[in-house]
Design a protein with these regions (language model features):
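C-terminal peripheral helix-coil segments that are non-catalytic and often amphipathic
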Residues: 76-130
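Soluble or luminal CAZymes and related metallo-dependent hydrolases
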Residues: 3, 34, 38, 108-116
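Hydrophobic alpha-helical connector segments
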Residues: 1-36, 63
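Residues at helix-coil transition
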Residues: 9, 16-17, 68, 122-129
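A generic helix-loop boundary/linker signal
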Residues: 5, 32, 53, 103, ...
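Hydrophobic alpha-helical bundle segments that form small-molecule/ligand-binding pockets
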Residues: 36-85, 127-129
């Protein structure tokens, strides 16, 4: 569990440090080949923790993709448009307190990333328990 949480933290930190990396990773299918040693290390840690090789690779891929997708969304909410407003300001103007999704301050921080990571971890635990 902590391995996957830490991996999400590292992916998020990397996306924060290098603006635009998030979308670049999604646009170039071979991007992951540049971090093969890192991937192997994470997968090996997960295998040592009890996951099968395929499960471990899937778990990291799921966490990584989720983290990157969340970062893309948060970056869009932070971005200032031609009208001088941020994405979150535009969303606030287009929603009400009765909308399905009501903007919250956390949306421009990490959004719901941590909840999603915990959801994935719980699901993986159930699969491993079988």
């Amino acid at each position: 569990q902590d391995i996957l949480r830490h991996a999400a933290e590292e992916v998020w930190a990397c996306c924060e440090k290098y603006p635009g990396l998030d979308i670049t990773i999604f646009q170039f299918p071979s991007a992951f080949t540049h971090i093969e040693d890192y991937l192997r290390n994470i997968v090996n840690q997960l295998v040592k923790a009890g996951l099968g090789q395929e499960q471990a690779a899937f778990a990291f891929d799921f966490i990584g993709d989720t983290t990157i997708a969340c970062h893309i969304g948060v970056a869009a909410l932070r971005q200032v448009g031609d009208d001088g407003r941020t994405g979150i300001e535009v969303v606030r103007d287009r929603t009400t307190h009765t909308s399905v999704y009501v903007p919250e301050p956390s949306w421009t921080d990490r959004g719901t990333l941590d909840r999603k990571v915990e959801f994935i971890i719980r699901g993986m635990e159930k699969e491993v328990e079988g």
